């Protein structure tokens, strides 16, 4: 079977020659003139360890054919990475729309999640496609060399922003549990946006040295024709500052938050049981108390019980939110830890470790880390009803929640029913007043209150002039 290349020329009809792949530029060139080569010549692969790879075999393979064969071998990898890119961009756009349009989701934690979705979406737009392109070109940089430092800068920026957002969310939840009054007072939308700006500022500061030094010295961002960080000091410092230190803070504050929630729930349950015992305790039987005292006691009892129910509800909501955030934290740590651990191992055991194995692991682990940006919207969909309903409506191009017809029927019918019942009751009262005759027992028939009975008795005494005691 012949492979046809450019200009419809088959491999068997082209003479042999010796091709050289330049390791610095990634370009192909001929070392021999095709006129001097015999069609029966054949030679073998020879590899120069530093800069070039000499390629020759039976049947001359021009550069375009080599590229086509190389791309065909990478089709499956490109397909998988393309699926990850599409899921990342589409899912995070849905998260941004949900927080922007749904009033139920407009709080401090969801603002952080929206900013996190923006970072993940930009990672899918600007970083992942270029990384997929390097896979197709055998992990060699196919773009101008000046763009390498910019691409690494964006990669580090958005990855650092993701871990910083999760760290800030963990700290914010812990402060909200420990000091809810202070947190609710200073947790306005403006304060939340200021915190988000601080997170992005820290992320920019951590990643800014890459373009500053990389644009001046290509050796810091190029290694054997591949675009990657070649400065060991920056790899070590950047890994700890951008990942391990925020990770430690995030894990500690998250477990402290869970512990505080359990303590609050225990105290709330004990407080509710104490209130119930005090409310049911009385020296006198309930039948011996007047209706006025019973009414006052019930009024004093209800606010406390309502407050207890509201506290339990808020604790339950916090526990559900911490569960969702805990899943997000766990997935982020599991997916990014292999890359950063391997990255540090590549620096520490540079001489003892196999460089090719470490490089292959890093190429796989970085895409596992990218996958965490696509997983977050799926977590929100599975564990949050508001996100789930919003996503389903947005996919159907319905950007506003439709009100249920039952609610409209209730609003329209209840006032009419209330009006009819009030008119009927008024008519019955009027008929009863017309049929009633004044007797001596008019004073004893009044049961609506002491003041009203006294006024009715006074009117009857003035009109009838009977000697009836109304006390």
UniProtKB/Swiss-Prot annotation:
SUPFAM superfamilies: Family A G protein-coupled receptor-like (SSF81321). The modification Phosphoserine is found at residue 280. It comes from the Eukaryota. The chain crosses the membrane at residues 81-97, 112-137, 147-171, 192-215, 233-258, 323-348, 357-382. A motif (PDZ-binding) lies at residues 469-471. Its main location: membrane. Disulfide bonds join 148-227, 349-353. Pfam families: 7tm_1 (PF00001). GO terms for cellular component: axon; caveola; cytoplasmic vesicle; dendrite; G protein-coupled serotonin receptor complex; presynapse. Keywords: Behavior, Cell membrane, Cell projection, Cytoplasmic vesicle, Disulfide bond, G-protein coupled receptor, Glycoprotein, Membrane, Phosphoprotein, Receptor, Synapse, Transducer, Transmembrane, Transmembrane helix. One of its GO terms (molecular function) is serotonin receptor activity. Serotonin binds at residues 155, 343. It is a multi-pass membrane protein. One of its GO terms (biological process) is serotonin receptor signaling pathway. It is found in: Cell membrane; Cell projection, Dendrite; Cell projection, Axon; Cytoplasmic vesicle. The record marks 229 as: Hydrophobic barrier that decreases the speed of ligand binding and dissociation. CDD domains: 7tmA_5-HT2A (cd15304). Residues 98-111, 172-191, 259-322, 383-471 are cytoplasmic. Residues 1-80, 138-146, 216-232, 349-356 are extracellular. A motif (NPxxY motif) lies at residues 376-380. The PDZ domain-binding motif is involved in the interaction with PATJ, CASK, APBA1, DLG1 and DLG4. Interacts (via C-terminus) with MPDZ and PATJ. May interact (via C-terminus) with MPP3, PRDX6, DLG4, DLG1, CASK, APBA1 and MAGI2. Interacts with GRM2 and DRD2; this may affect signaling. Belongs to the G-protein coupled receptor 1 family. G-protein coupled receptor for 5-hydroxytryptamine (serotonin). Also functions as a receptor for various drugs and psychoactive substances, including mescaline, psilocybin, 1-(2,5-dimethoxy-4-iodophenyl)-2-aminopropane (DOI) and lysergic acid diethylamide (LSD). Ligand binding causes a conformation change that triggers signaling via guanine nucleotide-binding proteins (G proteins) and modulates the activity of downstream effectors. This is 5-hydroxytryptamine receptor 2A. The lineage of its organism: Eukaryota, Metazoa, Chordata, Craniata, Vertebrata. The gene is HTR2A.
